[in-house]
C-alpha cells in the first residue's frame, strides 16, 4: 500500500511480560538521518527503557545510573550540537523523533531528556560563548552531567517576565559578577542537575528588558535545592524548587547579552514547544500499541471487542489524531531546521499534540474498561503523563492567545 513500509517492531510489554504484535508505521519520507535515529532509539527504548518504565512511575525514580550515560553514548544528548563540540550535528527533526521514541517507552524519561538536551544543552549551543561551550557541553553531551533550565517562579508562571529572582552586580575576591537572591519553582531535573540555565532580573526597572540568562553550577555557594515537588504524572522526572541565597555568579557565566535574556528565553521557548511535542507523539503511539492488541484478545458476547464498530471507531480516531499530530510536528521541526518556523506554529504543534494526546490516552482507558482504570495496565499512566503538556511550556490558553494575536497581527 502506498506510504507503508514493512512494519518495524514496536514491542509492548503486557502485564504478563509478553510481546504484543507490531503496528505498522507510515512513511513520512523524513530522510535517512531521521530514520536511523528512529530505529536506533526505538531499539534502545524497547530493550533498556521499557523494562524500567513501571519502576520509574511507581517509585518516582530517575534512572540516572541505568540510562543517562547510555543515552549519551548513543549521542542522544547532543543531537543538535555540532560535531566539533562532541554532538551529532543533526537538527530539530531528529531531536523530535528521539524524544518521541524515548517517550513511547517512558514519557517521564522523555521529559527529563527533553529538558536536558533542548532546554539546557541546545540553549548553551545557541547562546553560549566559546569558553562556555568548551566548559559545559562535553559533560552534558556525554551524559556525565544532567542539565536543567529555570524560568518559572511561584508567582511567575504564564507571566514569566514578572519573575522576582534578582541578580545584582557585585565583586567578590576581586572577581566581578552578580549576587542572586530568590527562588525558582517547578524546575525539571533540578534535584540531579549539574548545570542550570537560570533567568534572573538584572534591571528591576526595565521590565522584560531587564532579564539576563546565567549558567549556574550545582556547587555554587548560596545555591541549593528546595522542596521536591510531587506530581500527578511524569513521575520519575524529578521536579523541585531552586533557592538562591546570596549566590555569587562570576561575570563569565552570563549567557547571551546582559539584559537581553528575554530574547534568549522566548526564542528557546519556540524550539522547546516543538521538541517537547515529541513526548505526546510517543504517548499516543504507546496508547495504540496497548489498545490494539487488547481489542484483538479481549472477548465479550463471544467475540473480540475489536470486532465492534464503536471500538473500531475509537482506534480510527486515535490513529488519525496521532498521524495528524506527527505530520504537523515533523513539518514545523523541518521548518526550524530551515530557520523558517513561526512562533504561532511552534505554539500550534504543542497545542494540538497535547490536547490530542490527552484525549487519546483517556480513550485508551475507556477502551480497556475496568482494566484501564487499574494499575495493571499502563494506560492510566499515559493519561496522567499526557496532561502535563496542556500546562507545561506555556498553558494551552496562553498558546491560543499567542496564536490568535500573531495571526491577526500578521494579517494586519
Language model region names:
Residues 140, 155-158, 186-189, 203-205, ...:
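Short Gly/Pro-enriched turn/cap motifs at secondary-structure boundaries
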Residues 13-115, 127-132, 139-144, 159, ...:
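Alpha-helical interface subdomain recognition
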Residues 245-264:
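Long, acidic (Asp/Glu-rich), low-complexity accessory segments flanking structured domains
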Amino acid at each position: 500500500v502506498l506510504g507503508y513500509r514493512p512494519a518495524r517492531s514496536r514491542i509492548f510489554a503486557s502485564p504478563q511480560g509478553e510481546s504484543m504484535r507490531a503496528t505498522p508505521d507510515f512513511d513520512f519520507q523524513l530522510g535517512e538521518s531521521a530514520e536511523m535515529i528512529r530505529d536506533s532509539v526505538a531499539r534502545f527504548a524497547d530493550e533498556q527503557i521499557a523494562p524500567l518504565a513501571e519502576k520509574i512511575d511507581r517509585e518516582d525514580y530517575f534512572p540516572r545510573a541505568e540510562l543517562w550515560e547510555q543515552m549519551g553514548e548513543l549521542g542522544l544528548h547532543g543531537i543538535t550540537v555540532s560535531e566539533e563540540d562532541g554532538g551529532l550535528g543533526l537538527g530539530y527533526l531528529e531531536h523530535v523523533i528521539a524524544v518521541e521514541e524515548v517517550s513511547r517507552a517512558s514519557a517521564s524519561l522523555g521529559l527529563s531528556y527533553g529538558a536536558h538536551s533542548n532546554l539546557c544543552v541546545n540553549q548553551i549551543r545557541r547562546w553560549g560563548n566559546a569558553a562556555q561551550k568548551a566548559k559545559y557541553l562535553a559533560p552534558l553531551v556525554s551524559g556525565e552531567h544532567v542539565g536543567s533550565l529555570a524560568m518559572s517562579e511561584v508567582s511567575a508562571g504564564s507571566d514569566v517576565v514578572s519573575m522576582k529572582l534578582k541578580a545584582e552586580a557585585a565583586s567578590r575576591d576581586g572577581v566581578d559578577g552578580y549576587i542572586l537572591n530568590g527562588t525558582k519553582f517547578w524546575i525539571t531535573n533540578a534535584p540531579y542537575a549539574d548545570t542550570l540555565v537560570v533567568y534572573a532580573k538584572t534591571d528591576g526597572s526595565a521590565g522584560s528588558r531587564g532579564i539576563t540568562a546565567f549558567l549556574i553550577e550545582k556547587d555554587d555557594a548560596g545555591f541549593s535545592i528546595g522542596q521536591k515537588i510531587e506530581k500527578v504524572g511524569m513521575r520519575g522526572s524529578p521536579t523541585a524548587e531552586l533557592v538562591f541565597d546570596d549566590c555569587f555568579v562570576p561575570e563569565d557565566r552570563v549567557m547571551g547579552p546582559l539584559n537581553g535574556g528575554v530574547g534568549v528565553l522566548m526564542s528557546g521557548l519556540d524550539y522547546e514547544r516543538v521538541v517537547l511535542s515529541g513526548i505526546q507523539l510517543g504517548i499516543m503511539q504507546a496508547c495504540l500499541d496497548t489498545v490494539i492488541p487488547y481489542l484483538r484478545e479481549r472477548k465479550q458476547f463471544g467475540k473480540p471487542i475489536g470486532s465492534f464498530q464503536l471500538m473500531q471507531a475509537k482506534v480510527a480516531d486515535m490513529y488519525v489524531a496521532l498521524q495528524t499530530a506527527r505530520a504537523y510536528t515533523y513539518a514545523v521541526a523541518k521548518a526550524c531546521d530551515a530557520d523558517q518556523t513561526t512562533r504561532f506554529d511552534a505554539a500550534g504543534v504543542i497545542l494540538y499534540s497535547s490536547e490530542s494526546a490527552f484525549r487519546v490516552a483517556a480513550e485508551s482507558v475507556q477502551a480497556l474498561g475496568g482494566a484501564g482504570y487499574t494499575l495493571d495496565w499502563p494506560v492510566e499512566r499515559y493519561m496522567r503523563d499526557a496532561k502535563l503538556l496542556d500546562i507545561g511550556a506555556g498553558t494551552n490558553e496562553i498558546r491560543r492567545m499567542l496564536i490568535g494575536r500573531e495571526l491577526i497581527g500578521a494579517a494586519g
